[in-house]
């Protein structure tokens, strides 16, 4: 398989999985197990491509927050988005400076998929008894920020799953409201991560080793696919639970543990 086709497939995979609660990083690690490993920069760029999709999908909401910033509700919502981002940025930077790196084997990803799937089922069962609430509290904002760090440390956890379900557990029980907040927090989070990685690689003189055609194709594929997925998901969760995604995670994790040789 050519490098360009591999990049295209990885971009599509990123767009499909970044916003579904099934772990994009986990799926990319699994895919790269067979398609060949890519650089951290490549992975961050395609994540940024997927975030472009969020900007496009929520462009009206973003415009509403910007033009209506003088309104108390909009202003507080923006401040809570900022708080979630700052928690992720500060704690994430500490973790990064500590030298934490992604696992090179698939087994930890498989276990994270299974544990995350069980966690989703338990939270769904608990929140089903609660009234629908769409108010983002400061506790929810801080929790979402921490959940994003956990997802970055443990691939297979899923940034969207950990953050959405913690938000639901902390009181933001309406799925669409929780997903919207998490996706909007993802905009500054992923763009900041992309910029940080770009600067680190530029200082190390590693950017010249990137195949920019591959990166560009993967970025566009992730953006286009991500746009379709986010539009679909926001409609889907208005009348459906996340149960199907939880079952998929558990099944995929179990299959990986059964089929892959020990140490893979």
UniProtKB/Swiss-Prot annotation:
Its EC number is 3.6.1.27. The chain crosses the membrane at residues 38-58, 75-95, 106-126, 136-156, 181-201, 217-237, 242-262. Keywords: Antibiotic resistance, Cell membrane, Cell shape, Cell wall biogenesis/degradation, Hydrolase, Membrane, Peptidoglycan synthesis, Transmembrane, Transmembrane helix. GO terms for molecular function: undecaprenyl-diphosphatase activity. GO terms for biological process: cell wall organization; peptidoglycan biosynthetic process; regulation of cell shape; response to antibiotic. It is a multi-pass membrane protein. Signal peptide: none annotated. It is an enzyme of class 3 (hydrolase). InterPro entries: UppP. One of its GO terms (cellular component) is plasma membrane. It catalyses: di-trans,octa-cis-undecaprenyl diphosphate + H2O = di-trans,octa-cis-undecaprenyl phosphate + phosphate + H(+). It comes from the Bacteria. Its main location: membrane. It is found in: Cell membrane. NCBIfam families: PRK00281.1-4. Bacitracin is thought to be involved in the inhibition of peptidoglycan synthesis by sequestering undecaprenyl diphosphate, thereby reducing the pool of lipid carrier available. Belongs to the UppP family. Catalyzes the dephosphorylation of undecaprenyl diphosphate (UPP). Confers resistance to bacitracin. This is Undecaprenyl-diphosphatase. The lineage of its organism: Bacteria, Pseudomonadati, Pseudomonadota, Gammaproteobacteria, Lysobacterales. The gene is uppP.
